[in-house]
Regions:
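A polyanion-binding, active-site-adjacent surface
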Residues: 2-182, 196-202, 210-245
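The conserved 3'-phosphoadenosine-5'-phosphosulfate
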Residues: 186
């Protein structure tokens, strides 16, 4: 089966996931107490699938869906303020076909970019429990295996940074002590398994590398306080483009 079809099948599994009773209950609660401006919406209120270009060289990892954003619309970052920032930047730097997205059926598409999250359900107060993060990890690990062309991982926020390092370590990457901060860049590598022919070991071991770029999350808490400005955010995407050009 092609990786793109495996990704699609994985997302179907994600949507059906009910591993976390607290999150299942919270999603139903949110759908019953909608803000007035969303009263006419039929909330998605299920785990959110990741989305994007299955041949992407750039993987963007967020924290979790927003209760009245992606959890409402059914697509990550769609219909919330964080998404306004992210999608606008993706459009400006050539990774998206339009500068905003308000609904999952609005023909918004990503090019050479794929978006996922640390957990797939909106958590109460935007704070997932450690067990909930672990329950979601297998989905992300499978995505890493299927997104075979990814060269740059963009980490939106501290939790995405910490949990992605943990996942990459489990995939055999050499992960030294690293610190989170806006606009930092790291290069990680791992040794790939090499075949043994007629009992003879190969003369060299092949290394696979991946670049990490960190940024403050484009949440309202950061953007409205000035902790993250648009020029700061756009500098991250300039870094991404530069890395892709160097590695082409």
């Amino acid at each position: 089966m092609k990786p793109s079809l495996k990704l699609k099948k994985l997302q179907e599994t994600v949507i059906q996931c009910r591993k976390c009773p607290r999150l299942v209950a919270y999603l139903q609660e949110v759908s019953q107490r909608k803000p007035r401006r969303y009263q006419d919406w039929d909330y998605w209120s299920n785990p959110l699938p990741s989305f994007g270009d299955p041949n992407a060289r750039v993987l963007i990892i967020g924290l979790a869906p927003a209760a009245n954003g992606g959890n409402r619309t059914g697509r990550m970052f769609t219909g919330d303020r964080s998404g306004e920032w992210l999608f606008n930047a993706l459009y400006q730097f050539g990774f998206a076909n339009q500068p905003n997205s308000l609904r999952r059926d609005d023909d918004f598409k990503l090019d050479n970019c794929y978006i996922t999250a640390t957990i797939r359900c909106a958590p109460p107060k935007n704070k997932p429990l450690p067990k909930e993060i672990e329950n979601c990890r297998p989905y992300f690990l499978e995505e890493l295996d299927l997104l075979k062309k990814v060269e740059v991982i963009v980490l939106l926020g501290q939790i995405a940074f910490t949990q992605t390092l943990k996942s990459l370590r489990s995939k055999g990457y050499d992960v030294p002590p690293l610190s989170f901060g806006h606009g930092k860049s790291y290069l990680l590598s791992r040794k790939l398994p090499t075949p043994v022919w007629n009992g003879l070991k190969p003369f060299h071991t092949e290394l696979q590398t991946i670049s990490l770029i960190t940024t403050y999350h484009p949440s309202q808490q950061n953007t409205q306080t000035g902790k993250l400005t648009r020029p700061m955010f756009h500098r991250v995407f300039k870094m991404i483009k530069k890395k892709l050009e160097v590695e082409s």
